Amino acid sequence: LLWKNRDTDYLRNHVAYIKGEKYNFIADVNSANFPALKEAWMGTNSVGFALMNTQSYNLVEVKDGEERGAANGRIIYRALEVCATVEDFCHFLDTITKPSLIEANFGVIDAKGGAAMFEVDYYKYTMYDANDPKDAPYGYIARTNFSFAGEVNRGAGYVRYMEADRVLMRASAMGGITP
């Protein structure tokens, strides 16, 4: 399960069906600039690849005039068009032009049982595999607006993360969620 709370200044959003280059997909898009801008904020494609993001605020030192995470929506749109698996998404991130202008945590699941969280900056990423007990000892991975690989005590969403983790950990311990 991927779950996202879209806290954005863009109040008009809708779910669109998009005929992609390789795979068709449904995605949450900003109504005001769709389809002119090929941006999506979460979605699922025709082969069961699903992707969402949270803006991270502690991976990149943003320069004056730069928009934080300027490429995040374009990356989601493009990945939904061309990726089928978590491994495909790794390859996608490995081969995009750098600096990527990405600063985000991407949650990814696929129809083959793959599930991972990627903390992505302009040049590199850190992957956390939800199927690996060292990355997800309780069977889940949660993120808000900071990245574990980023600068400590910077970012946002620490209180939300602690609450989400508390709820998920209890549910996991009581059998309320299953990995």
Which stretches of residues belong to each language-model region?
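C-terminal, well-structured catalytic/ligand-binding subdomain of enzymes
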Residues: L1-Y77, A104, D110-P179
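Short, surface-exposed recognition loops or helix-turn segments adjacent to catalytic cores
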Residues: C90-T95, E103-A111
